[in-house]
Amino acid sequence: MQRNEVVQLTVVPKGLADPFPYILDYARGKRVLNVGASGGVENYLPTKRESWLHHRLGKVAAELVGIDIDSESVAFAAQHGINLLVADCEKCSFTQTFDLIVLSDVIEHVNSPLLAIKNLAKQLSPNGYLLITTPNPNHYGLVLRAWLGRHTEVYYDHVSALLPEHFQAISNRLGLKLCDVMFFSHLDRRSFENRLKSYLARLLGRLAPRCHGSLMVVLQLD
């Protein structure tokens, strides 16, 4: 939706306590393509397999295909019996279609988010879904840093920061339907400071969902 030259969301954003049950419900009994499947795989295999999104998707999906552009991480997964494909989501093509395509913290890495979404939409079955998670540019920590005059920390391979309104604009341009927008915060257990920040993000997110650390959008091939 557009008002004058400003994008208007067609859905009301919501807060989400835990994104994984939501993602797995979408994947249950479906043909699923997991894009960026080997991201962080070295942290999960072999001992923390149950926490790995690709493994969890495999438990509920009727069929699961995983791709990643990082050939080294794909090779690492293969050493542990996991078959993934080396592929670029901006260019890949399949002989089959998928009911659900998942991009979990991937879209901020790609050269062109719009081209990636456009190409992946071609791999969807009729009425299929694209489910995308990405860091939230309005995260309370970033706003606080701006107020305090501190520099913004950006990961070296993150090249875009997308708001829900950007996904609405992309959907409008590509003829997709924006079905849902949700904000959530992962619980970071790596240190006491990180846990404290996570709990604060969750607390503030209850009051204002856009304070959460991450966002999720669901796009449908309409």
Please describe what each predicted stretch is.
Residues 3-10, 16-18, 45, 90, ...:
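S-adenosyl-L-methionine-dependent methyltransferase catalytic module, highlighting the catalytic core
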Residues 9-25, 32-37, 61:
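N-terminal presequences and immediately downstream first alpha-helices
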Residues 21, 102-105, 156:
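Generic anion/oxyanion-binding catalytic loop in active/binding sites
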Residues 24, 95, 208:
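Residue-level marker of regulatory loop/turn positions in helix-turn-helix DNA-binding domains and
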